[in-house]
Every structure is written in structure tokens, then in C-alpha cells.
């Protein structure tokens, strides 16, 4: 096994990021561990002084992105794997969430991830190598009541990632979307954002789902350490998937969405096909 790869991991101080950083270091890889709170990973720096470089990074700041990548290249000479993990959740009915909260959610989860990816691509293109893992969510494939704004950011990540994967494939650069279900991270804990005011009409939909997530915090079925091993397996694979669904709950929700969508496609096929010009030639969007 080649353990010479250099991993660049965002949000490495907690949740998936912390688990993955620890697992990657234990396997002998080198890591550029980025976080807004580098003091929280000092223990890893002491344990692996030659393998890990802790870097302060707020992915919403362009200058910090540039500086972090420069530091990575100066320290280890290259980056082989980019893990876009940093992010947080905003839960509540779509109508309840303020414009400020919506914009902050997109700034971090979507634009921050996108800008870091774009900044890393010149290095990957130059080397004709690299693997990007965008940590999305099962909520990037199917949405639930109370998750509309959070899921909107993840749907956005999925959209640009699908297109980007096709653009960079000829350049020998890989991209994988990671879609976890409920895992024991800080998602439903201190990092969770909620509306300042609630609307009673959403009590049985959005509020019910959000309350369920909050009550589940600390008891989610997913193990972040096992998720880390799954992500390492993907990076070490010669033929990694475009999407990696993690967790039984995520797999079930994904299959339900596919089944429902397929049923609607079949039921409305006649209407779908009724909108073309009679003399139109058959085309493909793929």
C-alpha cells in the first residue's frame, strides 16, 4: 500500500474531519489538517510531528484558502487528496429561516467548498493527478421537512460536483461525493443553527423532524470512525465511485427516493413526451 499520499482535510478538529485525520495518520499518510481552531488538534501535531501540518483556515476567506494551499505545498511539496468536509447545519422550516442564515449556510457549505476546490484544481491539473472527496449528505440527494436550506446547499454541491467530475476525468483527477446519513458528530449539537422564531403551522412537519434530530444527538447509528475507514477505502481504490452512501438509514432513504421518482416518471411519461416538436430529432443531454 502506498502511504506517500498527502491529504488536505478541512474541518479536521471535530466530527468526520477529526475521525478521518486520525485514521489517515494512523495509516502512515501525511495530512494538512485545516480548521478554524488549530489549537484543538495540537495533540495530533505532538503525536505525528513529521506527518501532520496544522493550518488555520476559514474556507469563506479567499486569502486564507490561498495561504493554506501555499503552506501545504511548501510543507509536503504536493497535495494528492482534497477532503471538503467543513460545514454546519441549519434546521427549520424554509419560511422560518432568515435571509442572513440562508446566506451564511451557503457561504460555508457551498461557496467555501467550491472556492477551495477551484483553488486546488490548478495544482491537480498540473500534476494530472488528484482525488476530491466532497462530503455532502443523504440530504444532498433527498430532502426532509425542516432541512430545506441545509439540503439546498448540499444539492448545490452535488450539482457542481457531477459536472466537475466529468470535466476533470480526462485530466486523471477523480471526484467522489460522500453522502452520510445520521452519524455521531456535532451536526445536531452545538454547531446546529435554528430560526429565532418558529411558526406553529409547521409543528407536525419541520418542527417534528428537527426535534427528532435534536433528541437523537449522541445516539445516531453512524460511527464516524467507520465512515473514515470507508473514505480511505475509496481513496485507495483504483475505481472509486462517483457517490458513496454511508449508513443504513441513508441507503434506505436513497432507495425510497429512487423508487418514488421512477414511479412518477412512469406515471407521467405521456405528458413528458408530449412537449416536443413533431419533427424534432431525438437528442441526448448526456
Over which residues does each language-model region extend?
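Residue(s) in the substrate-gating loop at a strand-loop-helix junction
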Residues: 137
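Active-site helix of classical SDR
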Residues: 117, 153
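Conserved glycine-rich cofactor-binding loop
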Residues: 13-14, 37
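The beta1-alpha1 cofactor-binding region of Rossmann-like NAD(H)/NADP(H)-dependent oxidoreductases
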Residues: 57-67, 99-100
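A glycine-rich helix->loop->beta "capping" turn
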Residues: 50, 71-84, 90
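SDR active-site lid
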Residues: 170-241
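Substrate-binding pocket helix/loop in short-chain dehydrogenase/reductase
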Residues: 93-94, 101-103
Amino acid at each position: 500500500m502506498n502511504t506517500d499520499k498527502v491529504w488536505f482535510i478541512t474541518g479536521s478538529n471535530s466530527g468526520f474531519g477529526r475521525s478521518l485525520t486520525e485514521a489517515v495518520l494512523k495509516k502512515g499518510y501525511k495530512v494538512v489538517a485545516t480548521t478554524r481552531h488549530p489549537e484543538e488538534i495540537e495533540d495530533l501535531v505532538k503525536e505525528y510531528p513529521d506527518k501532520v501540518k496544522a493550518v488555520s483556515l476559514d474556507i469563506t476567506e479567499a486569502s486564507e484558502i490561498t495561504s493554506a494551499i501555499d503552506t501545504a505545498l511548501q510543507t509536503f511539496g504536493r497535495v494528492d487528496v482534497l477532503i471538503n468536509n467543513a460545514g454546519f447545519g441549519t434546521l427549520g422550516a424554509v419560511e422560518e429561516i432568515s435571509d442572513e442564515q440562508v446566506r451564511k449556510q451557503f457561504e460555508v457549505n457551498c461557496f467555501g467548498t467550491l472556492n477551495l476546490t477551484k483553488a486546488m484544481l490548478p495544482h491537480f491539473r498540473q500534476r494530472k493527478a488528484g482525488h476530491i472527496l466532497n462530503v455532502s449528505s443523504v440530504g444532498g440527494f433527498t430532502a426532509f421537512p425542516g432541512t430545506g436550506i441545509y439540503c439546498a446547499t448540499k444539492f448545490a454541491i452535488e450539482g457542481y460536483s457531477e459536472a466537475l467530475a466529468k470535466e476533470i476525468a480526462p485530466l486523471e483527477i477523480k471526484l467522489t461525493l460522500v453522502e452520510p446519513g445520521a452519524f455521531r458528530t456535532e451536526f445536531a449539537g452545538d454547531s446546529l443553527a435554528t430560526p429565532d422564531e418558529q411558526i406553529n403551522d409547521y409543528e407536525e412537519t419541520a418542527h417534528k423532524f428537527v426535534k427528532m434530530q435534536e433528541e437523537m444527538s449522541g445516539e445516531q447509528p453512524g460511527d464516524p470512525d467507520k465512515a473514515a475507514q470507508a473514505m480511505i477505502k475509496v481513496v485507495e481504490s483504483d475505481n472509486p465511485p462517483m457517490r458513496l452512501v454511508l449508513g443504513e438509514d441513508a441507503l434506505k432513504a436513497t432507495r425510497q427516493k429512487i423508487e418514488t421518482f421512477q414511479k412518477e416518471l412512469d406515471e407521467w411519461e405521456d405528458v413528458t413526451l408530449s412537449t416536443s416538436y413533431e419533427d424534432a430529432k431525438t437528442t441526448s443531454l448526456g
